[in-house]
Amino acid sequence: LVERYATLGGVCLNVGCIPSKALLHTAFVMDEVKTMAAHGISYAPPVIDLDKLRAFKAGVVKKLTGGLAGMAKARKVDTVRGIGRFVDAHHLEVTLTSGDARTPAGGKKTIRFDKAIIAAGSEAAKLPFMPDDPRIVDSTGALELPLIPRRMLVVGGGIIGLEMANVYSSLGSRIDIVEMLDGVMLGADRDLVKVWEKKNAPRFDRVMLKTRTVSAKATSAGIEVAFDGAAAPAAPQTYDLVLVAVGRTPNGKAIEAAKAGVNVTDRGYIDVDRQMRTNVPHIFAIGDIAGAPMLAHKAVHEGHVAAEAASGMKSYFDARQIPSVAYTDPEVAWAGVTEDECKAQVIKYRKALFPWAASGRAIANGRDEGFTKLIFDDATHRIIGGGIVGAHAGDLISEVGLAIEMGCDAVDIGKTIHPHPTLSESIGMAAEVFEGVCTDLPPARKP
């Protein structure tokens, strides 16, 4: 196993999913405490100790990376620390490093292989006009919590940018978000995103859509950024911290996979078949480098397929759905096909929606702004997609994913007894809405 960093686990475990969720949990608790005044319970304003918060985050990561290292050792996995680049179809040259992926440890090592699985991931995309300044960070830098800025700009309205905007806003920063497209959270249906927008309108100073950054200048007062577009401020704005979250670039070219004969696209992706096999039969590729969506759970599933296929098993990647979750507040989650995709692909569908304003548990939690939506094939009534917006939506979407994989229809889901009172029963109730038998909502008006 060739790994350039000091710990195993890749982006997700070290500088992605896990540390961000540790900080998002902290942010959620801070925000939740503020709402308790309406319940008759008030607290003093929080006192933030950044060193302790960083230590908490680091402890979470260390516990998991340590466990992963232990499992690798137990399975007798030989780890080589360094940066690997292909020499040909059966050799990889590794430049040995100290573990920070930069400092040479001295020497190189050539590894001969019969079969290889490429899991080299991706790097945060950069904007060429951004100066080299510690006050301009990517997601990795933002997770290090260098400071709590008075004003912060998030460039990019995708999931990563919005999650970090959530964290820094809860810690006390004033946030501007700029997105060149006409909406944030690309990929999710707009009705889900609208709930997020309404809830977060008071949280951020500006959400500038159809707007882009055109220049940035480092000054003693901060990073001075100029904008252009529909919502661009007339004058440049100055920020204490700028997060650039404009996507990620796969590392297909960086590892020189083409020298092994592997087809690498202009953007750095590696094409694979359903066994995760490249055009070179004994070389496989998984994860970010094998194509969108760039999600850890997709990569893990692909890794299982590739390992089994490499060992001779007839394993294939044939998932009907890959769930996506924005761990914002409220969370937004979806699985299967979206309404937008149904319309684009001319799929005949029907949807059913259960509002959390009718959920006893959501009301008791003081978080009834969300809803659960299921999408069914118009002819078969089998579920083909679904979306949930609200607190803990990410924990709820798995049932929708399983229902899609199992080919459940609305009756299967509606007749499944869900525990009461829970948020998960909104899934069963949405199916009942589709069948016209939901007694938890007023009767539907006849056309």
Which ranges hold each PLM region?
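A Rossmann-like FAD-binding core segment of flavoenzymes
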Residues: 78-81, 85-101, 111, 171-274, ...
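Active-site substrate-recognition segment that forms the wall
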Residues: 160-180, 198, 277-282, 290, ...
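FAD-site-proximal beta/loop scaffold in flavoenzymes
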Residues: 133-149, 235-310
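Glycine-rich dinucleotide-binding loop and its adjacent helix/turn
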Residues: 17, 115-174, 178, 207, ...
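Flexible, glycine-rich terminal cap/loop adjacent to redox cofactors
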Residues: 1-5, 11, 18, 22-29, ...
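Glycine-rich flavin
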Residues: 3-148, 181-185, 189-192, 198-203, ...
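Short glycine/serine/threonine-rich phosphate/pyrophosphate-binding segments
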Residues: 11, 136, 161-164, 170, ...
